[in-house]
Amino acid sequence: MIVEVAKSYLGQEEISGNKGFKSKDFEKKMKEVGFSAGQAWCAYFSELVWKEAGQDIKPFSASAFKTYQNYEKAGRKGVTKPEPGALVVWRSVVNGQLQWTGHIGIVIEAHDDHFVTIEGNTNDKGGREGIKVAMKKRSYNWKADKGLRLIGFINPI
């Protein structure tokens, strides 16, 4: 169900600068999970998808990495091989240093050499700041890739 919910939002676009969304229905749903204008929204998008699919969303935070930490504290240990519907979490890397900022998305396909995601607040280059909900092909690269370092996955229950 998570994958289907995520796919239903493909193409949703923001108003430049994280000011809101072109679809007022989508904006209303995002505000219900905590989004407000000016905020990065990848974690809010992932929370919305998991909420609509009936998953536990209590550990979610506006921060991708904090969300990962919260799920681990709640007993949902991170894994290195995801299932469809899993959360995938990255941390930003600047000048070789891990930052507290990051990015989060939903895995829709998991293969041996790559995985496919649907992510909010992404761009055509795959970075953490973007303009829309988009599908991405990602590698299991545990080093920095496009300014992001893969941290792990939280599988759904």
Name each model-derived stretch.
Residues 138-157:
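Low-complexity, Gly/Ser/Thr/Pro-rich intrinsically disordered linker/tail segments
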Residues 20-24, 63, 139-141:
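Helix N-terminus capping/helix-initiation residues
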Residues 3, 55-127:
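...with weaker cross-activation on analogous glycine-rich loops/strands in unrelated enzymes
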Residues 1-55:
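N-terminal capping segments
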Residues 75-78, 135-141:
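Intrinsically disordered, low-complexity boundary segments flanking structured domains
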Residues 126-137:
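A short macromolecule-binding patch
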Residues 41, 48, 76, 90-92, ...:
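Tryptophan-centered motif/residue detector
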Residues 5-9, 29, 67-74, 156:
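Residues that form generic nucleotide/phosphate-binding pockets
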